[in-house]
């Protein structure tokens, strides 16, 4: 959950947990797991994600869990969501969905997980649906592309 939503929800129920999911090439995962601002992995093709600094909106955010999602996991999930659910989501949303899945696996049955689907695939069309780009970056090709 984004900081403001997470803080608002947590102020109403202290049992709510806030998770940060980060893409490869960013340092937020390391920051929230070890206090270190070191980048993990190669740069991601996800635009606008993968910062290496603590911004004002993160300064007082109490993150309970942090998850790391690489581009392969993200793109596989996005292609699955297109095929099975008809959801044409962008890579930031793919990172969020994968984080929600990892959180659900960690917490187990009986919990409610909320995430934000914050972008669509139009912004990433030239990469997500480009066979050469996917092959050159070792990313999976869906059978329908």
Put a short name on every predicted segment.
Residues 1-2:
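Short, small-residue-biased leader/transition segments that mark boundaries at the very start
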Residues 5, 78, 100:
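Aromatic/hydrophobic pocket-lining residues that form π-stacking "cages" and hydrophobic walls in ligand
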Residues 6-13, 104:
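Surface-exposed amphipathic alpha-helices with a cationic face
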Residues 11-91, 128-145:
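Active-site/ligand-binding loops adjacent to catalytic centers
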Residues 43, 98-145:
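Phosphate-binding loop/pocket of nucleotide- and phosphate-handling active sites
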């Amino acid at each position: 959950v984004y900081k403001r939503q997470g803080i608002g929800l947590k102020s109403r129920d202290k049992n709510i947990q806030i998770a940060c999911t980060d893409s490869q090439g960013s340092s937020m995962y390391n920051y929230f797991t070890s206090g270190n601002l070191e980048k993990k992995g190669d740069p991601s093709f996800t635009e606008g994600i993968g910062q290496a600094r603590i911004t004002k909106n993160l300064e007082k955010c109490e993150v309970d869990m942090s998850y790391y999602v690489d581009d392969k996991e993200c793109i596989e999930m996005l292609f699955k969501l297109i095929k099975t659910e008809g959801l044409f989501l962008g890579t930031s949303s793919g990172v969020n969905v994968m984080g929600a899945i990892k959180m659900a696996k960690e917490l187990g049955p009986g919990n409610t997980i909320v995430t934000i689907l914050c972008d669509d695939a139009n912004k990433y069309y030239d990469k997500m649906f480009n066979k050469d780009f996917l092959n050159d970056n070792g990313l999976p090709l869906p059978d329908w592309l």
